């Protein structure tokens, strides 16, 4: 668990490092103002990323601005507009809706704000609008989970999926999960998706919807 937490902190630090490398080339300033926009801060993963970003900013003498849009893409876009208006040099961005991020990304590009996309990767058509991407191999993570389920439940299982269906990272994770089952059992039909619940990327919401589903 400690290693996983340190890896997430490193993700935030890497994002700040990438921002610094990009902005130095474009504008020789002693320090920069960096915006951080996750789609929620009710998830321990994103608070750990925030800790990593804050630590790296403190160590490099950069200023950090961040908001919690609370799983509201409209509010996230509005908060990013506010950060741009305040004069941020770069944005570390975890979009709520990876397929609907183009408007925000274009606004940043037009304003000269560098963007590092992390975790929930934008669609390939929008790659040219960002300056860097940091993400886990979510397909492989899902695959390994599916492989474990197949190997440890050889007779099959009823599966409850906790999803965030606007997040590409979750979509490919779930796809990888089912492939992991299919590739590692001869009776894949015995593994049934009995329900999909919306966790909204929130630990508390996920706990509540799973509790309700299991009753």
Task: Label the predicted regions.
Residues 2-8, 14, 25-215:
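A residue-level marker of the well-folded mature domains of exported/periplasmic proteins
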């Amino acid at each position: 668990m400690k290693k996983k937490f340190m890896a997430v902190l490193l993700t935030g630090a890497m994002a700040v490092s990438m921002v610094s490398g990009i902005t130095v080339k474009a504008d020789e300033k002693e320090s920069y103002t960096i915006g951080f926009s996750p789609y929620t801060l009710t998830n321990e993963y994103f608070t750990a990323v925030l800790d990593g970003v804050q630590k790296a900013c403190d160590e490099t003498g950069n200023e950090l601005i961040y908001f919690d849009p609370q799983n509201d893409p409209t509010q996230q876009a509005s908060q990013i507009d506010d950060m741009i208006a305040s004069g941020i040099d770069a944005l570390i961005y975890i979009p709520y809706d990876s397929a609907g991020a183009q408007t925000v990304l274009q606004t940043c590009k037009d304003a000269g704000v560098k963007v590092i996309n992390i975790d929930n990767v934008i669609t390939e058509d929008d790659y040219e609008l960002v300056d860097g991407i940091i993400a886990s191999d979510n397909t492989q993570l899902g695959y390994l989970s599916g492989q474990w389920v197949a190997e440890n439940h050889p007779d099959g299982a009823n599966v409850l999926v906790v999803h965030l269906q606007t997040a590409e990272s979750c979509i490919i994770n779930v796809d990888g999960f089912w492939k992991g089952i299919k590739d590692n059992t001869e009776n894949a039909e015995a593994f049934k998706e009995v329900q999909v619940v919306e966790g909204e990327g929130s630990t508390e919401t996920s706990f509540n919807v799973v509790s309700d589903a299991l009753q």
